[in-house]
Amino acid sequence: MSVSSCNTFTVHGITGEEFTKLSMTALKARALKHLEDQGKMLGIGHEDKPQSMYDNPQVYPQMFPWLFPYGYGGIGQARLKRKVSEAEHKKSLLMYHDKCFQTDQYFPIVAFNHEQMKAGITGSFLLAKRQKFSEISQRLMSLDNSILSGLIKRLTDGEHVRAETEKEKACFAVLDDLDHVGGHVKGSLTSKKYMRNEIWSLISFLGAPSWFITLSPADNQHPICLYFVDTGETFSLELRSSAARNRLIASNPVAAARFFDFMVRSFIKNVLGVDHDHPGLYGKTSGYYSTVEQQGRLTLHLHLLLWIAGALSPQEIRDRLISRDSTFQQDLIRYLESVHQGEFLTGSADSVRASVPMQTEARGGIHAVLQEQKPVNDIEAAAEYKDPTQTLPRPAPPRCQNLKKCDCKSCKSNGNWWKDYYTTVDDLLLKSNMHRCTTSSTAPATLPEDESSPSTSKTSKSVKQGPKGCLDHNGICRARFPRETHETTTVDENDGHVVMKKLEANMNTFTPCLTYLMHSNTDVTSLSSGTSIKAIVSYIYI
């Protein structure tokens, strides 16, 4: 069949384009006004029996008719069975070219919840210790089902239940002996137990880890993330306002997750040297273990334990330091100071702050959303200034072989690049790594004003929780700032303890090169004692 001409037609969705930019409060106000004006509506009923999420290819087209035109393309369709899993099908939909699945308000969370529910139902089982298996199996067979059902109902209703009769005690004894395992469910307590076992197995196999690294990519700042979020095909380093950036990021959580995955994989390959032809920044990597955690505003950051090939254990390092091996002490200090530090590169915090043309007006901690900035000092410099958190790192120019004696263009270009490197790293540290103690606050819940709806109130009478601060009721910082400062790196030859040079009390230790590459907050800690390793391991999987 040949088609000589084609006709275009418009498909009208449930809501028009003019409604997509309105807030939920404004939409409710519009709907109420429509009803008051005797406007018509479409009633959509539902069956008494809910739709099943198993073997039901039409459940997603029914829930999201605007995403599945004409009812085609549902998840779990017969022609894709045993070819593409439901999880992979959802991933492919989320990568659809026009990003309609990514930006839908409900599809990503509904699809993820279904995966979690199925994993919890089909991937769970009961686990018991082998030496108690015979005893527990007999106890299970002798349980009174009516008593067990009654306890379940009372617990479900929120009642605080205490075992009083022997039959009730037998039911509670089974709960103590059995461990409900859902290891396939991401984020479950059992998955955390698996993580703990994996970490300690790695420590048993590779020895003690040498470094603990935290990465916090700024999705609402980084141009790569904004490119993933936006619909444009051409990448550009366009600087946007904070409102525009935050609006884009909030509309597309999938793009933010893609950006985080890209940054982490780039870090592991290029900085750690994994599956690469060069050693890592900290040495030859023999292993790593990382976990992902969400922050208060639902963005992601990474905690990573790093093992270095040939690294000495904390006890071996301590023994060498106590033995007063001066050569080893000097080499160790030189290595530690070369890969992490706790102060600015070009001067004190005050001098760096004075040299930056733009300053952040208000922030709520190192992980908070950055606000608009105001110019200070030199107006001309402020006009040319670009916030480094919104730009990409500049590649280093080729290095001249005779750098110390040569004065060629390549050498001058290299010198200018290093000067820019130092100032950029300090600017990034000032914006991303300086801790500012704040108190928790509450504020009236403010609602966006709809110009077409005069009845909409600007401010709600309710009070919502404001940004959570780090100061407790005694005024003590929960993050343990300010920290102790030290003018130089010293070694206590009595107990082998190394005290690193640290000039900034409100800054964690970091790696300058890593800060420059990530253009965001990073923390790097040397694990030089067994106590610190145990504390970090517990922190990672809790």
Where is each model-derived feature located?
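Intrinsic low-complexity, intrinsically disordered terminal tails and linker regions enriched
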Residues: 1-302, 306-542
